[in-house]
């Protein structure tokens, strides 16, 4: 969808479609040193219930049009790992961040688990099942990237993000 160059790395915004019409935006941070001749290890990050992928990537906006955070906090795991030469993938939990836009537009919080869980149950999915499936689709895609060390991928989740992380593991 978009690529922005940062100091010593680039941020790529992608969308996965695990189900027809179900767009799952995610961020890919790739160090400038990564290439098909020099693949790098990968960190796959899943935020907590009240975090977004942008926070973990040290970004200030989903559209990447703003400069990155000048001094990201300790939980900006993707940012800190890419600065150490790793690639990092960051995916919001289902119903949060950009996937929670309907809630934000209605003036509520940035997540809507209850309605999403109800809709998913009506389609014979659970929230954890759908979130884990979407993450697995993205993880499978990562393994096809020439810059990724396919045998050196770490999964990390914060709080609620540990649930799909454990399913992926």
Describe the function of each predicted region.
Residues 80, 167-168:
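Hydrophobic/aromatic ligand-binding patch that stacks against planar heteroaromatic rings
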Residues 141-148, 162:
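Conserved helix-loop functional segments at active or binding sites
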Residues 38-39, 44-137, 143:
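Cap/lid segment of the alpha/beta-hydrolase catalytic domain
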């Amino acid at each position: 969808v978009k690529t922005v160059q940062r100091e010593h790395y680039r941020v790529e915004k992608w969308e996965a479609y695990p189900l027809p019409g179900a767009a799952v935006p995610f961020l890919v941070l790739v160090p400038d040193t990564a290439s098909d001749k020099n693949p790098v290890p990968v960190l796959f990050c899943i935020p907590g219930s009240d975090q977004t992928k942008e926070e973990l990537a040290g970004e200030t906006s989903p559209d990447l049009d703003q400069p990155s955070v000048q001094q990201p906090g300790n939980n900006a795991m993707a940012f800190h790992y890419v600065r150490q030469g790793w690639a990092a993938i960051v995916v919001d939990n289902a119903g949060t961040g950009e996937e929670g836009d309907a809630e934000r537009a209605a003036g509520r919080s940035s997540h809507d688990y209850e309605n999403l869980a109800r809709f998913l149950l009506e389609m014979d999915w659970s929230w954890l099942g759908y979130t884990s499936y979407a993450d697995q689709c993205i993880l499978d895609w990562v393994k096809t990237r020439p810059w990724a060390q396919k045998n050196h991928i770490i999964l990390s989740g914060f709080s609620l993000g540990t649930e799909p992380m454990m399913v992926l593991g």
